Swiss-Prot record:
Subcellular localization, as worded in the UniProt entry: Secreted
This protein's UniProt keywords: Carbohydrate metabolism, Cellulose degradation, Copper, Disulfide bond, Glycosidase, Hydrolase, Metal-binding, Polysaccharide degradation, Secreted, Signal
Chain sites annotated for binding O2: 51, 186, 195
Name this polypeptide is given: AA9 family lytic polysaccharide monooxygenase F
Gene Ontology MF term list: hydrolase activity, acting on glycosyl bonds; metal ion binding
């Protein structure tokens, strides 16, 4: 094959890698009970998709939100998101396992932080207005072991595309949206290259906590130029500047 054709093919493959999507959340598991998420590549095409706990989206391509859309509602719960009809019960202090349909197993294509937020619905989450939700960062993980270049997303893959988040024991009871997100960094070394995959699920939190921390609107969580949004993952980093508001320490 002529060198010009090889170069053209390589360029096309690289471009495909930049736009290809990664995945979505299929379910959460709480105390052994499974609660279904929005199956984006099938429910979207149904006239009457089943009620579920995940917010519906118009994302049929395992797609992402790019940094140039971080100031829009797309970043809140993904593109075209509307509230799920159901809410899963969880006790503050408990762990939630979250399972994705897939995530790229090519080492660099999968790496990035996993960040979790809570936003109080101030009513039933099935009628929540995403523009009024204010998110509190409750868990954020990135590099697990710099010596082996292991990220939390590597562990996600090793654990059958499942990760976990613990609801803080100090959080007051109520109806909440859990915003669970992976930010893929394989193209983040260039402007507008990071890929955000926000997923929202409804919870009813019980317990004896009393904290009602103030949060941040989805459209103000990140900016396109933040450290951690523009980031060279190929430089063998030993640390990662977590984007977004400060972590809740309650």
């Amino acid at each position: 094959m002529a060198m010009s054709k090889i170069a053209t093919l390589a360029g096309l493959l690289a471009s495909a890698g930049l736009v290809a999507g990664h995945g979505y959340v299929t379910k959460m598991t709480i105390d052994g009970e499974e609660y279904g998420g929005w199956l984006a590549d099938s429910y979207y095409y149904m006239d009457s998709p089943p009620d579920n706990y995940g917010w519906s989206t118009t994302v049929t391509d395992n797609g992402f939100v790019s940094p140039d859309a971080f100031g829009t509602d797309d970043i809140t719960c993904h593109r075209g998101a509307t509230p799920g009809a159901l809410s899963a019960p969880v006790t503050a202090g408990s762990k939630i396992d979250i399972t994705w349909n897939t995530w790229p197993e090519s080492h660099k294509d999968n790496q990035g932080p996993i960040i979790n937020y809570l936003a109080k619905c101030n009513g039933d989450c099935s009628s929540a207005d995403k523009t009024s939700l204010e998110f509190v960062k409750i868990q954020a993980e990135a590099i697990v072991d710099a010596s082996t270049n292991t990220w939390v997303t590597d562990e996600l893959i090793e654990n059958s595309f499942t990760t976990s988040v613990t609801i803080p024991a100090s959080i007051a009871p109520g109806n909440y949206v859990l915003r669970h997100e992976i930010i893929a960094l394989h193209s983040a070394g260039q402007q507008n290259g990071a890929q955000a995959y926000p997923q929202c699920l409804n919870l009813v939190v019980s317990g004896s906590g009393t904290d009602n921390p103030s949060g941040t609107p989805g459209t103000q969580l990140y900016s396109a130029n933040d450290e951690g949004i523009v980031f060279d993952i190929y430089s063998n980093p030993t640390s990662y500047p977590m984007p977004g508001p400060e972590l809740y320490s309650g």
